[in-house]
């Protein structure tokens, strides 16, 4: 190993730091994308890849807000210890039950920004022992705290692409 080579632990810490930074940036990207999207556009244009059943920009934004909270609660459960079984959720049912497309886009985005700041603070405050925490994900099995940090930004990117595709269809 040369002096320019990072240890495995240092590399892992760098990956974690970068994913937490990505969590901050993806919300800022959403704010920029949505800054000039009016309510009518946010609630009428649908994902062209899914036809009439495709989600609107507002529905995608509500999904991001709700899953930010879900991901946060799962990470909290893991940090508390004991390799918990993490709860699963039906995202389509949530969209219907919570009437996503009837919500206020500005309020939804503000709630996501607030939730994300709390989530970033959570990750930045984790101890080395808490970073080692695991849970059992309902779809993926064994799930690490690093997986949890990576999931947030990757989930955001998936849906940012979806939102830009919806808006580009206008």
Predicted regions and their residues:
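Extreme N-terminal tail/first-helix region
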Residues: 1-29
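Short, contiguous alpha-helical
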Residues: 2, 6, 46-94, 120, ...
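Solvent-exposed interaction patches of small proteins and small membrane subunits
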Residues: 11-21, 43-49, 81, 102-103, ...
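Amphipathic, non-membrane alpha-helical segments in soluble helical-bundle scaffolds
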Residues: 13-24, 54-61, 105-109, 146-149
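Acidic/histidine-rich alpha-helical segments that form the ligand environment
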Residues: 22-26, 31-35, 95-132, 152
């Amino acid at each position: 190993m040369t002096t320019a080579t990072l240890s495995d632990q240092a590399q892992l810490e760098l990956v974690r730091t970068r994913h937490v930074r990505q969590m901050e940036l993806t919300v800022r990207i959403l704010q920029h994308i949505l800054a000039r999207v009016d309510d009518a556009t946010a609630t009428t244009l649908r994902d062209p890849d899914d036809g009439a059943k495709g989600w609107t920009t507002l529905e995608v934004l509500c999904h991001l807000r709700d899953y930010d909270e879900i991901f946060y609660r799962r990470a909290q459960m893991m940090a508390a210890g004991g390799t918990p079984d993490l709860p699963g959720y039906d995202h389509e049912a949530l969209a219907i039950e919570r009437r996503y497309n009837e919500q206020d886009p500005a309020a939804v985005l503000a709630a996501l920004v607030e939730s994300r700041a709390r989530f970033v603070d959570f990750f930045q405050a984790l101890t080395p022992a808490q970073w080692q925490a695991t849970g059992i994900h309902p779809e993926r099995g064994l799930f690490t705290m690093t997986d949890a940090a990576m999931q947030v930004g990757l989930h955001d990117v998936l849906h940012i692409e979806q939102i830009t595709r919806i808006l580009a269809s206008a």
